[in-house]
């Protein structure tokens, strides 16, 4: 909860167990954004502004971690919005200071930042959601940086500086996000991915190729992704694989690799 710690509901009995300052005096804060049951008799807790805690369910002892600007191996931010345990047993945290990987042996953190070899690959410093998809890739939702994708196989063998990321950014075409601020990631039973954004609605990414690909009409002459006329009367391809489309009033539109490369019209003397 936001103000009163953690509530555990036993579905069989309908009773709650409370984890707060009264029952766990060493708990760093009762303000909580997220909780993960690690399956190892520990609760992993992300606080609103008080860092990260690990609560032992055996004896209710805690380990508390805060950001230290003088320690590069400390938690990168004190606001922890999301925690994930991946299929390798790694604990990932999304904070207001970036993406972090917890090292249980050294009780320290590895922070993932921009790859020094990729000037366009910038990781946001504010992470809202982390999900492991069925293809063994980590999807990271962030503020103003869209989706960052990390292949978990990479992270087992490379240092953070060497790891490369994939990115889904905001844009105007059908292959881009409607908004750069992504708050939630969900993969359904059909392997489709749903993204909840802040201001851009829901983005849907199908696991299967579309049944139809359409070439739409646009009144903008410079739009090379579209037809210049709504009425199509004939279609054929040439030996180079280009698509020739005859229209009623727009002449002949020629497409190559899904882009319009030429228009032949009577008015211009080309037909």
Where are these regions (language model features)?
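Carboxylate-rich, polar loop motifs that coordinate divalent cations or form catalytic acidic clusters
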Residues: 1-271
